[in-house]
Amino acid sequence: MSSASVVEAVSVNSAIPQNRNYEYVLEVANVRKEFPGVVALDNVSLRIRPGTVHALMGENGAGKSTLMKIIAGIYQPDKGQVLLRGEPVRLEKPLDAQEAGIAMIHQELLLMNPMTVAENIWIRREPKGRFGLIDHDEMRRRTQELFDRLNINLDPEAEISELSVASRQMVEIAKAVSFNSDVLIMDEPTSAITETEVAHLFDIIRDLRAKGIGIVYITHKMNELFEIADEFSVFRDGQYIGTHLSSNVTRDDIIRMMVGREVSQMFPKEEVALGDVVLSVKNLSREGVFRNVSFDVRAGEIVGFAGLVGSGRSNVAEALFGVAPADGGAIQINGEFVQIKSPNEAIQHGMAFLTEDRKETGCFLPLTIQENIQSAVLHQNFVKKGFVAEAELAKEAVEICNKLRVKTPGMDEVIENLSGGNQQKVLIGRWLLTHPKILILDEPTRGIDVGAKAEIHSLITQLAHKGVAVVMISSELPEILGMSDRVVVMHEGRVTGILDRAEADQVKIMDLAAQ
């Protein structure tokens, strides 16, 4: 289809029931949401028709999840409004959304243990019998009635802990229907279930659609969009791009809408003379997580890893660093086979690993900058005859902080008090102190401001000039394209392609990432 036809307005779906006095069951009008230093949503609008499946598409960080959390009452918009059945509503908490008829099934399912299926569905709404006691027989009867309506084959008295991910999703759907919801939001519902389970889920979604429920379906998988969605909307960089009928577009049209921007000039890539292969990975696998992952990284080379949420990129990084070791395949460093079963072994082999979640698995928040920086080297360069060379360590830590331009009153400042960008610089400084041969960076600029991003990109380039082999995982395609010599693309635990810098572009990467 032509680019001109991509922007055509969506016509009314003739299959939608017409016995209502409103056209849209849910509307979001001119919503803006800001977080410190970030505009997550910029004047966004969205309309959901009753009796349709409406998919939301966009790169990671496009604003989809933020918008859904506003609709579900988790966040409140700074500007704009939400309308339900044509009337403005104020959703100050998730319970407000539930009572208004909006239910959300999160990617991380929120069912409670140790409780039964029925107890989870009717929590805080349990039917009461004589003397105000919970009527368990009635609760079971209501649950079974729900399951019969939805064609769900589960025991209402089963413990949640005994259920598969797919079965737990069915419980979440039944719970949503029990609120008589008019709107059901589903966030990546097929990310952890089998093809057979997906088929069953789609049957239930079609049944809910036939009952007039408006379903908002967040997905990265284009085949699902064409199979289950009536229409879809695309978001990019916190902005609404457009809404279209699924039957009117091609896969290439959608990719073009999702990635329609040029790489920013803040990602300059300097040419570096590449050396020998430092890291060689062959058929690396971990059962149920990733399989047969192979790639090489040369001295001075930056190899970017691209892929959608759940593609397995971070799992590969954790395996390389011994956080969650692989159970198959081989790793070579400078031509020698190595076994890495722990982070300490990885550090001894010259590896460094910047994790994707600096607050949870990176920073030691109650400790000082000095203590955070020195934490990786206490058993490395600065230990001599059982004693830590404290003066030498402190001196180099200060030099690194100055080099990275960490904004802080002093080395004794608690890292929790720093901005996200400065925390990230400290974590990079921690690994620079180990003088690594291999640097693995997982989302190195996530959640930091533009200025700090540029400084970190410059630092990565400097390390490449010094011969460090860099593996960089990023969900930002401009960052991947702007910084990488080669791009490894993953999808559902496997490598779907490796692109040289000259041939890589956003459309090719998204095509490989969505296979």
Swiss-Prot record:
Annotated InterPro entries: AAA+_ATPase, ABC_carbohydrate_import_ATPase, ABC_transporter-like_ATP-bd, ABC_transporter-like_CS, P-loop_NTPase
Reactions catalysed: D-ribose(out) + ATP + H2O = D-ribose(in) + ADP + phosphate + H(+); D-galactose(out) + ATP + H2O = D-galactose(in) + ADP + phosphate + H(+)
Homology family: Belongs to the ABC transporter superfamily. Carbohydrate importer 2 (CUT2) (TC 3.A.1.2) family.
EC number(s) from the headed UniProt entry: 7.5.2.11, 7.5.2.7
Name recorded for this polypeptide: Putative ribose/galactose/methyl galactoside import ATP-binding protein
Compartments, record wording: Cell inner membrane
Annotated ATP binding sites: G58, E59, N60, G61, A62, G63, K64, S65
